[in-house]
Design a protein with these regions (language model features):
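Structured, solvent-exposed acidic/aromatic patches
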Residues: 1-180
Length: 180
């Protein structure tokens, strides 16, 4: 949890940031929560690197540079403030990244009739013109076992469990630092 970016991002707590592997796995030094500003800077850095490294769009079942750009647009929108107190620089960056995705001509809004059956379509079907990225989970592809990743997010026809929670161990680690 973190406060909105426009509410003192330097002072409010964000999430713990760990870059790289610890040298000593037996004696971990648990990181404190970083500031909201540092958290957003890390997210932006990661997404810009992803945009640089990812390929063009192939299918919604694969992350692409357009998925990174769509997320960059969303992050900058969150940073752009409120209607009464906007940050025009971040609003412009949000617009620029969203426009990159729109102008790519890789995506289009679904018709009303197609949208009404959206959840019945395979994530990588040609008719999925509106989806930029989706975790692929098709129950028939996995028989009784479910998709290792997709089943965590969706429960379809009795397959999967559709729940993702932070583990008790993770929550305990967060509380150990005393800065939550």
């Amino acid at each position: 949890f973190g406060r909105p970016y426009y509410q003192e991002p330097e002072k409010n707590l964000g999430v713990p940031i760990v870059n790289g592997m610890p040298e000593d796995m037996d004696n971990l030094d648990l990181p404190d929560r970083s500031s909201v500003k540092d958290t957003y800077e890390q997210v932006l850095s990661d997404l810009k690197k992803a945009e640089e490294l990812m390929s063009d769009f192939k299918s919604p079942a694969y992350a692409s540079k357009y998925a990174a750009q769509a997320l960059l647009a969303k992050v900058y929108m969150y940073m752009s403030g409120t209607f009464e107190n906007p940050n025009k620089e971040y609003a412009q960056l949000s617009y620029n990244y969203a426009n990159e995705v729109i102008e790519s001509n890789q995506f289009s809004l679904l018709s009303r009739s197609t949208f009404m059956t959206y959840n019945e379509l395979a994530p990588d079907a040609a008719s999925q013109t509106e989806t930029i990225f989706a975790v692929k989970f098709i129950a028939s592809d996995w028989d009784d076992w479910g998709s290792p990743l997709g089943s965590m997010y969706a429960e379809i026809d009795g397959q999967g469990w559709g729940e993702v929670y932070a583990s008790a161990k993770y929550m305990d680690l967060l509380h150990e630092t005393g800065k939550n």
